């Protein structure tokens, strides 16, 4: 495993630790999820380029599409929670049920 792969895996694990530590605020959780998705994108791109696996060239693009959808839904949820309750606590998400 090269140094670049180890750095990317460390970035992913630090984002995961940040998600576990700062899970009370929705904005912090969304930022950690974005860090995880970006490190997965870079890792997938490097793996595909180094292995010359041409059939999986679209996988990083699909991963970015899912990351953009996750970010849009997360930001919409953040706006709804902050407009309704004035804070971005994750515990307020249980109160949004019908």
Swiss-Prot record:
According to the record, the segments passing through the membrane are 1-21, 29-49, 61-81
Q: Which Pfam families match?
A: Oxidored_q2 (PF00420)
Statement: the UniProt record of this protein carries the keyword Transmembrane: yes
Q: Where in the cell is it found?
A: Mitochondrion inner membrane
Q: How does it sit in the membrane?
A: Multi-pass membrane protein
Fetch the InterPro entries from UniProt.
NADH_UbQ_OxRdtase_chain4L/K, NUOK/Mnh_C1-like
Q: What is its EC number?
A: 7.1.1.2
Has the keyword Mitochondrion been applied to this entry? yes
Tell me, what does this protein do in biology? Core subunit of the mitochondrial membrane respiratory chain NADH dehydrogenase (Complex I) which catalyzes electron transfer from NADH through the respiratory chain, using ubiquinone as an electron acceptor. Part of the enzyme membrane arm which is embedded in the lipid bilayer and involved in proton translocation.
Q: How does it assemble?
A: Core subunit of respiratory chain NADH dehydrogenase (Complex I) which is composed of 45 different subunits.
Query: This chain belongs to which protein, by name?
Result: NADH-ubiquinone oxidoreductase chain 4L
Q: Which organism is it from?
A: Megaptera novaeangliae
